[in-house]
């Protein structure tokens, strides 16, 4: 029951609501409208994490949860007990973007050569030490595993493993984990780019996309394979498959279209 968290928010006079992008997508799919059914007058901010919050998620929250709320998509990690990128109540917010780097975080995006880039996809990095940076791992006295985990990609630069973009607004867009990035024909594609298109469709409740080495007997490329869970009673027929592929192609590129 998606309404139960809003029941708590109303009963407790909640001011800050932490949730996930997947929860926001799920309650949008069932057309939940807390703004009409609950008293959320005390609610000042909503934080979304766990996966990228798509622009349509921003639209839904402001239309059907609360119009005068700070909606902040945030991203960091358990290992740093913090966020590299988060919200700022004093700054503008743009749909589909994370507002800014966290305090004390020299967050940036590097291309494959280790050069900072704007408006293009690359690796999310932190270029300087930060207050909550772990200094090592247990049972790793020489620090080999620690360095391999964070500093192997770029010398003396923390590479967090997120495929991201720094925008012209100094905000950030995260497209997924780097190790889950698809690479058909040598083109890097973030999984969130495909999820955003597929999950727009009313027929689709959930989706999972993978990259499969292809052909199996002598892999020379990666093919994109998409799994979908439909609303109860629906069937994945040729017409729906064609529509899914059409939506992806029209809103991204032919490279994003699943082979299967």
Where are these regions (language model features)?
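Short, intrinsically disordered, charge-balanced linker/junction segments flanking boundaries
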Residues: 1, 22, 253-260
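Gly/Ser/Thr-rich phosphate-binding loop
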Residues: 6, 11-19, 28-93, 106, ...
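AMP-binding/adenylate-forming catalytic core of the ANL superfamily
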Residues: 10, 17, 130, 135, ...
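Generic beta-strand/beta-sheet core signal
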Residues: 17-20, 48-49, 74, 83-87, ...
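Short, P/G- and charge-enriched loop/turn segments at secondary-structure junctions
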Residues: 91-97, 148-152
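Short coil-to-beta-strand transition motifs
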Residues: 98-104, 158
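Conserved ATP/PPi-binding loop(s) of AMP-dependent carboxylate-activating enzymes
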Residues: 102, 115-154, 189-190
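Hydrophobic beta-strand positions
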Residues: 108-109, 165
């Amino acid at each position: 029951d998606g309404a139960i968290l809003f029941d708590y928010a109303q009963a407790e006079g909640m001011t800050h609501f932490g949730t996930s992008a997947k929860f926001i997508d799920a309650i949008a799919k069932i057309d939940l409208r807390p703004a009409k059914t609950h008293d959320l007058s005390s609610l000042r901010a909503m934080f979304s994490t766990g996966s990228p919050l798509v622009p349509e998620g921003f639209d839904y929250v402001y239309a059907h949860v609360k119009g005068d709320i700070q909606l902040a998509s945030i991203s960091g990690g358990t290992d740093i007990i913090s966020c590299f990128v988060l919200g700022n109540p004093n700054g503008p917010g743009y749909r589909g973007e994370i507002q800014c780097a966290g305090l004390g975080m020299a967050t940036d995006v590097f291309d494959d050569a280790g050069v900072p880039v704007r408006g293009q996809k690359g690796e999310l990095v932190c270029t300087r030490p930060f207050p909550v940076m772990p200094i090592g791992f247990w049972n790793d006295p020489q620090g080999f595993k620690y360095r391999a985990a964070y500093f192997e990609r770029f010398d003396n630069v923390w590479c967090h493993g997120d495929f991201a973009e720094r925008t012209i607004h100094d905000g950030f867009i995260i497209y997924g984990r780097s190790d889950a990035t698809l690479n058909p024909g040598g083109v890097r594609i973030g999984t969130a780019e495909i999820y955003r298109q597929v999950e727009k469709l009313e027929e689709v409740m959930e989706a999972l996309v993978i990259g499969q080495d292809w052909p199996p007997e002598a892999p020379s490329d990666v093919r994109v394979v998409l799994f979908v869970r439909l609303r109860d009673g629906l069937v994945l027929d040729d017409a729906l498959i064609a529509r899914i592929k059409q939506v992806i192609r029209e809103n991204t590129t032919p490279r994003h279209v699943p082979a299967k």
